[in-house]
Amino acid sequence: MIWHILGILVFVVIYNIWRYYHKDDSYEYCSDVQDTVDNNQGISNMEAISTRQLALNTIEKIGSEPQDTEEARIQFEYQGVIFLMEAVNDCAFVNLIWPWCHSFSKFDIDEFARVRQVVNDINLQDTVSVVYTIADSDDVALHIRKNFLFIPQIPHIEDYLKLMLNDFFRTARILELEIEKCRVQECEQHI
């Protein structure tokens, strides 16, 4: 037992002597990290732009014309589809919504069961949320929604926004295909 303690003490002494005579590179790394942090803070101070203004500028850069709605949302058209964006100045995240991406009659019970199953599956597996609402008319409307980070430090932010928008189109395709698969499976079961 005494040999174990002596061995540990000898190791500690040798390590401290080695550290004393050799330059420790970890301190240089710390100064490099501090310089990087200082540079990033300088960049963020230069790019102090509100989230809403960043959203408006980015929407214009992807070739769409942003418009303000009565609910303080940003409405724009991208590839023939109207989107709504909720961007608040004191928040680094935005909500993007594709309203009325799919609709059906609220009296069609079979369709409602199919859509409910598909919506639940999509919400479990995807990065977007699909929600349904009952409108004043006899329709049930499906909306696709996504909440994501939107800050000036994101490189190629126009491509980033296009990528987020493409998630909506992919989800809408999946939604239509899965609903159709459910219809076909029901028809096969009745035959």
Regions found by a protein language model. Give the residues of each.
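Charge-rich, low-complexity N-terminal segments
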Residues: 3-89
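Generic alpha-helical secondary structure
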Residues: 48-52, 108, 112-115, 161
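A generic structural signal for beta-strand entry/edge sites
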Residues: 71-73, 90-93, 137-143
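Long, continuous compositionally biased terminal/linker segments
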Residues: 79-113
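Short, internal acidic amphipathic alpha-helical interface segments
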Residues: 99-147
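A short acidic/glycine-rich loop-to-helix N-cap element
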Residues: 149-164
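Short, well-ordered, aromatic-rich surface patches in folded extracellular/luminal domains
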Residues: 160-176
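Short, highly charged C-terminal tails/helix-capping segments
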Residues: 178-191
